[in-house]
Regions:
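Residue-level detector of structured alpha->beta connecting loops
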Residues: 32, 73, 99, 133-134
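A short acidic, helix-capping loop that chelates divalent metal ions and anchors anionic groups
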Residues: 43-51, 110-115, 143-147
Length: 176
């Protein structure tokens, strides 16, 4: 019997299906990967913007993580919208003890421009989750938030990419 590789997404929802766990699960399926999901936040949004965000309770978040990690061990984990420090503090121990690739998508702002993460969580992400990541997938505004300044020059972008890459736990990088 052949089993599919297993990946876990830990993120918020997007009822339009264009982002969040819905998009992650579609991507997993398109690549013949068995996808699992832990929901961090329920987001009411569409192409015009974010209407409402409600974070799951800490008890529910912990129960979802424990359910997944105590049974079907993921072979890769991707995080998306982790909107608060409290959410990140619950997730971090699971990320620290796993031995598989970790993709960090530092979701900070919706495509519509709406803020999706609070200020203290931005700092926590950079200090505590970034070093655990195998790879990070920021867009330009998120990359600028991570490095702390605007990036207008492609050479500066490559230089910062190298520097940040060295801070991650990546086993392979073109810059190592």
């Amino acid at each position: 019997m052949t089993y599919l590789p297993v990946a876990l997404t830990i993120a918020g929802t997007d009822p339009s299906g264009g982002a969040g766990i819905m998009a992650d699960l579609k991507s997993f399926q398109a690549r013949d990967v068995y996808g699992m999901a832990v929901v961090t936040s329920l987001v009411a949004q569409n192409t015009r913007g974010v209407q409402l965000i409600e974070h799951v309770s800490t008890q529910m978040l912990e129960a979802q993580l424990e359910s997944v990690f105590s049974d079907i061990k993921p072979q890769a984990v991707k995080t998306g919208m982790l909107a608060t420090t409290e959410i990140m503090e619950i997730i971090q121990p699971y990320l620290k003890k796993m031995d598989c690739p970790y993709v960090l998508d530092p979701v900070m702002v919706a495509t519509s421009g709406d803020t999706l993460i609070d200020t203290s969580a931005r700092s926590y992400l950079k200090t505590n989750l970034l070093p655990l990541a195998t790879i990070i997938t920021p867009n330009l505004p998120e990359a600028e938030e991570i490095v702390g300044f605007s990036i207008h020059d492609p050479e500066v972008l490559r230089s910062e990419e190298r520097r940040v890459g060295k801070e991650c736990r990546s086993r392979w990088s073109p810059y190592h």
